[in-house]
Amino acid sequence: MARFVVVALLVLLSLSGLEAIQRAPKIQVYSRHPAENGKPNFLNCYVSGFHPSDIEVDLLKNGKKIEKVEHSDLSFSKDWSFYLLYYTEFTPNEKDEYACRVSHVTLSTPKTVKWDRNM
């Protein structure tokens, strides 16, 4: 009887993990300092509140992937959702556009958020 109860509990526990909650990422794009044309700065893309942890994040300049990008370690919040910070050095000017593109299982297509120099 005890063996049956243990097996039943193991089956229930394994089935409960099949329906893990998926959460779409929140994406925030901002510069470390207020933007000034010609003055070096850092472009940040903070991605938070997502689950599961598998995610792809790219910083873009004029729609093209920036290669020299660093990021924080993957971390999780009290609610077990994940967050990351991607960042790179850049020098803003009038003509270049910057953005952050995120791909995640909760998104049917990658989501791109543009940097607003006035934020």
UniProtKB/Swiss-Prot annotation:
Annotated disulfide bonds: 45-100
Keyword vocabulary terms for this entry: Disulfide bond, Immunity, Immunoglobulin domain, MHC I, Secreted, Signal
Cellular compartments annotated: Secreted
Gene3D superfamilies for this protein: Immunoglobulins (2.60.40.10)
InterPro entries, per the entry: B2Microglobulin (IPR015707), Ig-like_dom (IPR007110), Ig-like_dom_sf (IPR036179), Ig-like_fold (IPR013783), Ig/MHC_CS (IPR003006), Ig_C1-set (IPR003597), MHC/Immunoglobulin (IPR050160)
GO cellular component, one term: MHC class I protein complex
UniProt KW Secreted keyword: yes
Pfam name, any one: C1-set
Keyword Secreted among UniProt keywords: yes
Reported impact of residue 24 to T: In strain: Isolate AoAz2
Domain of life: Eukaryota
GO biological process: antigen processing and presentation of peptide antigen via MHC class I; immune response
Residues of the signal peptide: 1-20
The Ig-like C1-type domain, residue ranges: 25-114
Subunit structure: Heterodimer of an alpha chain and a beta chain. Beta-2-microglobulin is the beta-chain of major histocompatibility complex class I molecules.
Family: Belongs to the beta-2-microglobulin family.
Role: Component of the class I major histocompatibility complex (MHC). Involved in the presentation of peptide antigens to the immune system.
Protein name: Beta-2-microglobulin
Lineage: Eukaryota, Metazoa, Chordata, Craniata, Vertebrata
Gene designation: B2M
